Amino acid sequence: MPQPTRLSMLAIALATMLTGCAAKSASGTTDPHADEAAIRQTLADVEQRINQGDIGFVDVFAKDAVIIAPSTPDIVGFDAIRTLYSGIMQTMAMNVHFSTEEVVIAGDLAYEHGTFTLKMSDKATRKVLQDVKNKHVHIFKRQPDGSWKTWRMMTNSADAAAQPK
């Protein structure tokens, strides 16, 4: 069973689950409003898949995706990300809720930032091991087919830092 400290870092990384989404118009050009709507809907879809225990949510990551979380090495590449979440989901039940504060489209890159809450429970005992609120930034890269994939993601705690005494 993973140590709670490691679980904290892995839980923080969980915010990255955005599925690929396409928003090309009939003329083949991109529409920033449609891209933003697709990214927001994608996050809602990923939330549902995670809460149902569907490991397929990881298909949202680009092959060269990187998860950057505090106090843990970067998780680099699709295979490493899939391995990470497969291991977690074998023993943990997760309940996540995303809140998007902003989506900005800039050509073939876009970013989304917001917060998420995550509760992780041991599947065998149902004991809650993590119950956190975090902030996140996702950077998406438009794929050749027009879909968006999570390319980079960074998370940190939404709790105020402890004040020195």
Give residue ranges: language-model regions.
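A short hydrophobic beta-strand element
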Residues: 108-118
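Hydrophobic/aromatic beta-strand elements that line small-molecule binding cavities or substrate pockets
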Residues: 81, 85, 98-103, 116-118, ...
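A short, structured loop/turn motif at beta-sheet edges
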Residues: 103-110, 141-147
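Short beta-strand edge/turn micro-motifs at domain boundaries
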Residues: 22, 133-161
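Bacterial Sec signal peptide processing site at the extreme N-terminus
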Residues: 22-35
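Bacterial N-terminal signal peptides that target proteins for export
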Residues: 1-9
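A solvent-exposed, acidic/Ser-Thr-rich amphipathic alpha-helical stretch
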Residues: 33, 37-38, 42, 54-106, ...
